[in-house]
Amino acid sequence: MESLLNRLYDALGLDAPEDEPLLIIDDGIQVYFNESDHTLEMCCPFMPLPDDILTLQHFLRLNYTSAVTIGADADNTALVALYRLPQTSTEEEALTGFELFISNVKQLKEHYA
């Protein structure tokens, strides 16, 4: 069975990447993909990690109300948006999930970055 990432690229009308799976969306949104046997994870850094603890708490509270999870990158320098899809997702579900993810990231960048 073809991987979910390849099926997503097909649905987007793109060729699968030969090296690091990365999509750059028109307004500077960089989506990195990590695929395992069970999930396809989409990750997008969207702003520097806030110095203010109240701002950080605000972002973490968003995790209770959205399918997109907010976290910090491995270096604790940026906030990242994460979204996971099961490998059993259809092309249509993958495309819908990708569009939801991009929409959420754009909203986060608009309102907070």
Curated annotation (Swiss-Prot):
It is found in: Cytoplasm. CDD domains: T3SC_IA_SigE-like (cd17022). Induction: Transcriptionally regulated by InvF and SicA. Also regulated by SirA. Keywords: Chaperone, Cytoplasm, Virulence. The keyword Cell cycle does not apply. Pfam families: Chaperone_III. InterPro entries: T3SS_chaperone. It comes from the Bacteria. GO terms for cellular component: cytoplasm. The keyword Signal does not apply. NCBIfam families: PRK15202.1. Belongs to the IpgE/SigE chaperone family. Homodimer or higher-order oligomers. Molecular chaperone required for SopB/SigD stabilization and secretion. This is Chaperone protein SigE. It comes from Salmonella typhimurium (strain LT2 / SGSC1412 / ATCC 700720). The lineage of its organism: Bacteria, Pseudomonadati, Pseudomonadota, Gammaproteobacteria, Enterobacterales.
